[in-house]
Amino acid sequence: MAAPIMLCDTAGMSNDRWLECRMHGPKGDIPYTVGGSDVAAIFGVSPWTTPLELWLIKKGRMKPPKKMNADQLAMGHMLEPIAAEWYARKSGNHVYQDTGLYQHADHPYALANFDRKYIRASDGDDG
């Protein structure tokens, strides 16, 4: 399997620009994208979005609903560095922030932002 393609660095990017990149890629040339946050909706287990709603949003036939879980999102962002530090201490792995927006090599609609990556202490390999 080919390595993911880094499309751009999102460090310092405005939230609106980041959302544009997530929706259509940094050049705006991807008709629709699927990210990690969409997977729960695709499988029908999201408490916020149904598969039909997601399809309508991706096709531009429905506006995304306002974030009903804004407090949970904010808390998650606040706790990310703490969780990363805890994992690093427990595992011995080196954890670092990654601000890239990546595209799957075989499926150009599949995009991802990795909040953190790690280097395994056992062999120095990326994880």
Enumerate the predicted regions with their spans.
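Short, hydrophobic/aromatic alpha-helical segments in well-folded domains
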Residues: A83, N113-D115
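Charged, glycine-rich intrinsically disordered N-terminal tails and low-complexity linkers that flank
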Residues: M1-I82
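Glycine-centered structural positions embedded in regular secondary structure
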Residues: M75-H77, G100, A112
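Active-site beta-strand-loop-beta-strand hairpin of nuclease catalytic cores
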Residues: K117-G127
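A short acidic/basic microdomain associated with nuclease active sites
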Residues: A88-P108, D115-K117
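Short glycine-rich, polar/acidic loop-and-turn segments at beta strand-coil junctions
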Residues: K59-R61, E85, T99-L101
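Signature of the catalytic double-stranded beta-helix
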Residues: G76-H94
